[in-house]
Amino acid sequence: MPSSLTKTESNSDPRTNIQQVPKALDKNVTNSGNLDSTSSSTGSITEDEKRSEPNADSNNMTGGEPIDPRDLDWDGPDDPDNPHNWSSLKKWYTTMTSAFLCLVVTMGSSLYVSSVPELVERYHVSQTLALAGLTFYLLGLSTVIGAPLSEVFGRKPVYLFSLPVSMLFTMGVGLSNGHMRIILPLRFLSGVFASPALSVGSGTILDIFDVDQVSVAMTYFVLSPFLGPVLSPIMAGFATEAKGWRWSEWIQLIAGGLILPFIALMPETHKGIILRKRAKKRNIALKKFSREAQKEFLKTTVTITILRPLKMLVVEPIVFVFSVYVAFIFAILFGFFEAYAVIYRGVYHMSMGISGLPFIGIGVGLWIGAFFYLYIDRKYLFPKPPAGTQPLTEKERTSKRTTPYRGARDAETGELLPVVPEKFLIACKFGSVALPIGLFWQAWTARSDVHWMAPVAAGVPFGFGLILIFFSVLMYFSTCYPPLTVASCLAANNLLRYVMSSVFPLFTIQMYTKMKIKWASTLFALVCVVMIPIPWVFEKWGSKLRHKSQFGYAAMEKEAETEGGIDDVNAVDGELNLTRMTTLRTMETDPSTREKPGERLSLRRTHTQPVPASFDREDGQHAQNRNEPISNSLYSAIKDNEDGYSYTEMATDASARMV
């Protein structure tokens, strides 16, 4: 899962603290992005902002011009304020709090389903209209506005504001008199204010774990949006059966109240927010967020979260195919909320409470799939460094850790090797086969002459395949596109996933009633069989599709060449090895472009205009102040022999620094 940019030795001794921002973004605007885990992400994309000199802050304390907040950085790799240097207890407290918050808000989807039978009987509404409460909540969860807000105000304030507001709307549903014209808008608003838990949570995890440690934490976090809908029917079934439909809302309200104090005690993790607060304590004057920057930020937010995701669904085959794939299997899960009632209450005559227990089978499959993915990640994608591997140097460290990064290494040089994006599809291959097996299993065993344990066990391969496919797609998107474009990919996936999931429960009962259980589940299974070749197809032709992408790294380089041209004469001395990929900062490196295994792809700095004299390494003034901006800089990954290219990263004024 994780990745990193590590440095090579060079005469110029460059550092890797490169901040990536959109081309249209003003220098005062903070970047944004998201990772739903079911999703997406976002998280902070300013993790490796430029590193200021240790005495930069102290120089400003004596007066002078206010400095750009983005010029702030840690005092060094051992800075105790850096979340990467927190104790394991503090890291895991923050991780589990974020994960349980995700669990609480996703529980709200299926908790409501248990109230539908009583709403239909008591208030004389149609079953489809009653189920619309689930639809409206899922539509609310599809919004991703929380991620960019967290880049401005921080993770913790967004959590503390959004959850109580969502709980107030949940309380309104519980106190309503059953009129759907009241319940439906309240359910939608509850989902909207619950959505930041999903869109901001992944950024919280990436804020605190080093690149080669994030897999385990992210796995537990991504499990939450799946476990929430699976576990809540078990609780709500017994509660509504004994106390009435309103308890489907009270359970979520109680869960939200329990997690709120833990959020209040959770530390802020966003790098920019931590450094800004510390700057105020040190009496450092900071530039304010100008009105022009606010407008630019709003424009960028709308582009990243709404306009670009919709366009990518139309013009990007990678985004469209995998988003439809994930959305369909996720929608099947939500369709099971009604299908399981038909199977276990209709065929096996279980009570409301007992009929929720079969979801345990899917939950077991989710856990097995998560552990299996961790095994693939540690043994195949990013294996442990071999014995004798040199520890990281002080220049290579971004935290106090000195252990080598994980990952495949060149047998001769011991250098970390890049990972082709299609390599992450290996887990998707296992999942694509397991998913239809579980559906066929359920289809042909859910009958009265077969014990109920048989269809319950069918949930294990279904959950196993579901989580593996989601993990693979998440990583594939993250390594195919630049950081801000990844945020749009995940937003597109999140939107399509929850929109499709909101529709499936509306026709599931009719489908299972008229087609019968056998053929309804078989139909789902056959669609999944048709989708089995997807990971193999993209493994073979994915590289060509990436090179033709309108939003990938190749497109960015073509745009840079068109607008400014690349002048190799202005190339800055020094290279940066590209070794691993993260969900927020990645460069695509395809070993198929290398002429021999030992050849490496490196990150070289070039410029779209002549370099000012102040950037000359021999210039005395620059030697004193090494924080000069590189105007209109372009970061391009090229082969060592400069014969051909890999891909590029764009940066605007003041977004990248010579250090």
From Swiss-Prot:
Induction (UniProt): By transcription factor HAA1 in response to acetaldehyde accumulation.
Superkingdom of the organism of origin: Eukaryota
Extracellular side: 121-128, 179-187, 237-246, 338-355, 445-456, 510-518
One example GO MF annotation: antiporter activity
Gene Ontology CC entries for this record: cell periphery; fungal-type vacuole membrane; plasma membrane
Major localisation: membrane
Entry's Gene Ontology BP terms: spermidine transport; spermine transport; transmembrane transport
Its membrane topology: Multi-pass membrane protein
Cytoplasmic compartment spans: 1-99, 150-157, 209-215, 268-316, 377-423, 478-486, 540-659
PROSITE patterns referenced in this protein's UniProt entry, alphabetically: SUGAR_TRANSPORT_1
Compositionally biased intervals (Polar residues): 1-20, 28-45, 622-631
Bilayer-spanning residue ranges: 100-120, 129-149, 158-178, 188-208, 216-236, 247-267, 317-337, 356-376, 424-444, 457-477, 487-509, 519-539
Family: Belongs to the major facilitator superfamily. DHA1 family. Polyamines/proton antiporter (TC 2.A.1.2.16) subfamily.
Name by which UniProt lists this protein: Polyamine transporter 4
Species annotation: Saccharomyces cerevisiae (strain ATCC 204508 / S288c) (Baker's yeast)
